[in-house]
């Protein structure tokens, strides 16, 4: 697809992500983000509908290893609004694009941009606007577009349009 920002490196991107062996890193990010925004990170032990109150490293560690991740909710634009993380003994629900981008960024090994460049130091996905394809080995391939929250008009497209003399 072509767009005003199709020449920008993050117009389309692809990331390989794998949560195997990254439970400690994922938990650390979740607890850090919980401190900033507790209503957007919820931990649930298996069989419980009530979340863990005031989670700490020990209570989250008791959930065991991460065994899966999946889209839990998408907005009308297709951007991911909630991510479900499945543990051996429970689950976590992660809300807001920033939190989702941080968690999956920790699991991403690399990011290939639209211009073919590869970014290997990924700590956060460029956008919450992506599709998830699960691999047989348990990993995931994330196909995304844009840079930022993934909602509304692309900042890069706006810049290109303004440079071309367009206005509203």
Question: Positions of the model-derived regions?
Answer:
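Conserved, single-site charged/polar hotspot
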Residues: 1-168
């Amino acid at each position: 697809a072509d767009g005003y920002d199709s020449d920008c490196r993050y117009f389309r991107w692809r990331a390989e992500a794998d949560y195997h062996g990254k439970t400690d890193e994922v938990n650390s990010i979740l607890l850090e983000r919980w401190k900033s925004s507790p209503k957007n990170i919820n931990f649930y032990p298996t069989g419980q509908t009530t979340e863990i109150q005031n989670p700490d490293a020990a209570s989250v560690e008791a959930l065991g290893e991460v065994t899966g991740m999946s889209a839990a909710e998408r907005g009308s634009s297709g951007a991911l609004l909630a991510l479900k993380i499945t543990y051996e003994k429970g689950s976590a629900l992660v809300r807001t694009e920033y939190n989702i981008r941080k968690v999956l960024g920790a699991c991403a090994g690399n990011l290939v941009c639209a211009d073919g460049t590869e970014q290997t130091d990924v700590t956060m996905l460029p956008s919450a606007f992506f599709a998830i394809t699960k691999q047989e080995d348990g990993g995931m391939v994330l196909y995304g577009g844009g840079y930022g929250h993934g909602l509304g008009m692309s900042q890069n497209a706006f810049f290109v349009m303004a440079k071309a003399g367009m206005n509203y």
